[in-house]
């Protein structure tokens, strides 16, 4: 047996369809809807939302997961594999995924195109620049930062308190040395000195706005609502106030159009927006879903991290804006992650898996499956049926898969073993059939007056504090919530400012249901600690901060960037 091909080698060996042909398979017209960026990528004009509105709606499927290990459990690969699998059973699918950030691609996480024989291609394009959307977000964000400092320099007519300015600068590189900086040093003509810093572009509120805007007009309005700080009277100061929103909208005019690509098997893939999964929604764009929902029998999208994170935000933030209701959700699980949730193993990013983790041990899988059960419950809290996808690895044992199936059955979820990484769509046919049956069964039950109907976890009228406590108790399993004095003051201020009807997006670790990354499984008897509360008014949510949140990552001792290069023919090498 030869050495296994890398993701890049597999992707490079694919025979790709012209992007116009991919568009035609979705009902998109080349001359009206597609703006090609080379042979295999195109922007999709937003007029497609209206043009396709009379077509039947696809079944809407969310791909989520158990609480992941630092290695990730294969949500994107499963999303791609599932999209491909539907064609094997005579159905059409479109997938919608987030756009990759280059910071993690050159760091330790790896790419965002899937893996093995379930990838979106060309994968180098997806992971490196694509059509330049992240650069546009970076430019728009920094344009506003420049306008703020320019306003201070030219007399500060709005009376902005410099220490209150929360709008930092961004770049799409992991660079810890820029987390905290002082700007405006030098001569008086070099600006007003103040402390600031850089975040990674994916953490920008502009990226969250790009993901949640439902039209170009909505994008412009949301940009204007961004709060950058407050004045001497304590009133919020917006991007509109400093007259920066118009220029930002112009910079983002093309970036709001979703990118069309394809999988290795020719399934259409809408790739758009990439907001952080910790402090923002962690979902691809609303406009991509509004287009995709009219282009196939099934639209499959994914949400970042576990169901307590990305899925909760998908249901309570993204779906409120799009008006779309999911028909089913997938919870991706792996044997290695469930063993880790037993609390008996430690998995570290960049380090080899512990040898004992690979030994047959269904008891440890069952011990860790409490996390799986809780994440299935988190899906069902919203009236959505769940199907478990066991993302199989060669080191798994049949008894361990059986243990996962038993745990899923206990909470009323179907289960499917998936081998889409090695087999492509064929390896996820069992999952596609399980979803088809689950959706049909739920619809039959609904017609009889039973079955699940999609519902939000809380009404927008609920006070912010109560929304936080509802998510903490119902989704995370917390006993209660403890607030720092600063967090309580911020909540009161947001209610007074008229932001109380916004949904909440709790910023916490993705490595645990709790706010402590060391607590595995489904911990009980703990309290969520909220140390600070911030507002993304433009994006349209309040985000309480629980624990330490890094918005600018650093590079590891040996980042992926060390291995990435060009060969003698100008081809990228070392990229996954």
From Swiss-Prot:
Q: Which InterPro entries does UniProt cross-reference here?
A: Formate_THF_ligase (IPR000559), Formate_THF_ligase_CS (IPR020628), P-loop_NTPase (IPR027417)
Which residues does UniProt assign to the signal peptide?
none
Q: What name does the UniProt record give this protein?
A: Formate--tetrahydrofolate ligase 1
Q: Which EC class does it fall in?
A: ligase
Which top-rank group of organisms is this from?
Bacteria
The species this protein was found in: Rubrobacter xylanophilus (strain DSM 9941 / JCM 11954 / NBRC 16129 / PRD-1)
Catalytic activity, reaction form: (6S)-5,6,7,8-tetrahydrofolate + formate + ATP = (6R)-10-formyltetrahydrofolate + ADP + phosphate
From the Swiss-Prot or TrEMBL record, what is one GO molecular function term?
formate-tetrahydrofolate ligase activity
Gene name of this polypeptide: fhs1
